[in-house]
Design a protein with these regions (language model features):
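N-terminal localization/anchoring segments of enzymes in phospholipid and broader phosphate metabolism
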Residues: 1-171
Length: 171
């Protein structure tokens, strides 16, 4: 890379000043070599049932590289499954039209214990997280909030079912 395209920074952690460049460099013209191609999530095969697959073997999910649809369908199936007793989940960034929250509300309405740990300090999504937290509570879900000194920045789900008197866990 030529020296004219290098940027010297005295602090290795404070690169906020680079945000000023976003208005000067457009992805749709001028310097396409400076941008990665837009990634499109891989779609699951037709008829793919994640809820059944995770009972057979481990499945690694990587978003946004894979479609979130199988996961949402799994939550909806778990919410309707009479053997499922609870769904517990951490929520970091909730979209204004969150289908995940809709699935959790549906599960609560079906009598499942639903617990959501919500990070209210999710940059740019704080208001969505606050609004959805209220709707989750109104639906009967238990909503927990992050810790003062720590930020919840992970997506974890625990689905607990009881089959033949034994508890089974999907994480």
């Amino acid at each position: 890379m030529p020296a004219s395209r290098c940027y010297a920074q005295t602090s290795p952690l404070d690169t906020g000043c680079l945000f000023k460049l976003s208005g000067r460099i457009a992805n749709d013209g001028g310097h396409p070599e400076m941008f990665y191609p837009v990634a499109k999530p891989m779609q699951a095969p037709a008829g793919y049932d994640l809820y059944t697959e995770v009972r057979k073997h481990d499945v690694l999910l990587a978003y946004p590289y894979q479609s979130i649809r199988p996961f949402i369908r799994m939550l909806l199936r778990a919410g309707a499954d009479p053997n499922v007793v609870s769904i517990k989940m951490t929520l970091y960034r909730m979209a204004s039209d969150s289908q995940i929250v809709g699935a959790l509300i549906n599960a609560a309405e079906n009598g499942k214990e639903v617990v959501a740990m919500v990070e209210l300090r999710a940059r740019f999504d704080e208001q969505n997280n606050i609004d959805w937290s209220k709707q989750l509570q109104d639906a009967g879900c238990t909503v927990l909030y992050g810790f003062d000194d720590y930020k919840v920045h992970s997506k974890l789900t625990l689905i607990t079912s009881r089959v033949d008197g034994k508890y089974r866990y999907l994480t």
